[in-house]
Amino acid sequence: KKVYGDDLKAVYDKSSGTAPFKAGLELVDGYMYKKEGFSDDEQVVLENGHKFIVNWTEGQKTGFFLDQRENRALVGSLSKGRNVLNLFCYTGGFSIYALASGALHVDSVDSSKKAMMMVDRNVALNGFDPSLHTSLCCDAIDYLKNVPEGKYDLMIVDPPAFAKHRGSLKNA
């Protein structure tokens, strides 16, 4: 609160599902701080001029992966004039940057219907021509197996963690 002052609207702790079990911490997801009048519903966040709908409570982890900010910017810098494939797209962060940077077309692929609806909403929120983007709700690996050679100039492959720790590596 000292850093953001009145601009701080909420602090939501969502570490119960991500903190190592061995840490022995009793973690409960919830608000650590919430400004009066702050809605629990979706919020729009702004990153480098791009808007993203985020649901802190319902989304995966935080609902938006802040640690990928530099990678999204890198994808943007490589996307102009290219056909882009974003596999495991979740809410479409890489897709938005590619579109904003002048990609010819972006295909976003994820197996989650909910995630694909969010990608479409984020594309609309940022005012992109919907004909430049296609959302494909299917298994990303199966899709990749059937992609014709040369269809894409740039591919983003950012899968979820299949194994969170060494003990579950065999099952992953």
Segments the model singles out, each with a brief description of its role:
Residues 91-104:
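Conserved SAM-binding loop of SAM-dependent methyltransferases across substrates and taxa
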Residues 114-156:
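S-adenosyl-L-methionine
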Residues 8, 81, 151-153:
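Local beta-strand N-terminus motif with an aromatic residue
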Residues 66-82:
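Conserved alpha-helix/loop element of class I SAM-dependent methyltransferases that forms part
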Residues 81-90:
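Conserved class I S-adenosyl-L-methionine
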Residues 105-110:
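Conserved SAM-binding motif I beta-strand of class I
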Residues 2-64:
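Non-catalytic substrate-recognition/targeting regions of SAM-dependent transferases
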Residues 154-172:
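Mobile active-site "lid"/loop adjacent to the S-adenosyl-L-methionine
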